[in-house]
Amino acid sequence: TELTGRDAKTIHRLLEVDFGEENGRVKFRRNSRNPLPYDAVIVDEMSMVDIEIFASLMQALRLGSKLIMVGDPDQLPSVGPGNVLRDLIDSDVIPVIHLTEVFRQAAESLIVTSAHAIVAGEMPDLTVRDNDFFFLQKSSSEAVLQTVVDLCARRLPASYGYSPVRDIQVISPTRLGACGTAELCRKLQEVLNPQDERKTEQKFGPGVFREGDKVMQIRNNYDIVYTRDDGEQ
């Protein structure tokens, strides 16, 4: 949007989602009877689009409109049903352009070479250490948790000058357990933003939101913030 000067929005917002449901499905104001007024629509991160949302988008395109889809079929498929991008590419029905050069990291970056190995079904070389990729092996979940906390609170800030809140993001594949997001957030909050009578707190379920916490919005509210916006509360 910075280069084109045009707005970008989610498919739900583009199709003018109606927050009521019909037969258990989300309703959109844009459809075959009320199509989008555009000659071309570009969809980024197409691997995240499930078959139901894609069907709604196709119905809302007017005759003669062009649909340009951008995405990586090797990323995780959508949470909802279908593997739309992969199926479209494999169909040999639509024109496909494969981009092979990585610009986000250097070609020799261990992040890049390790990712390519995993996509090819091979084990990445975990013995090599580089500035952008490190593998730390631990024997228990508790040891992993303590290592993550130590990396965020001490080692990465000391080695690279990172701010634990602004420059570091921890990702976990689970919510529960010693290495799940719930316990990671609790432990990191305890170390990085401890309880202080001068800070406002708000209890929410089993956890506590504290002034100065890093938070992430995970459900869209178009009047306030967008999904994946994060900041300090």
PLM regions: where:
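Conserved helicase motor core of P-loop NTPases
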Residues: 73-232
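ASCE P-loop NTPase helicase motor core
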Residues: 1-129
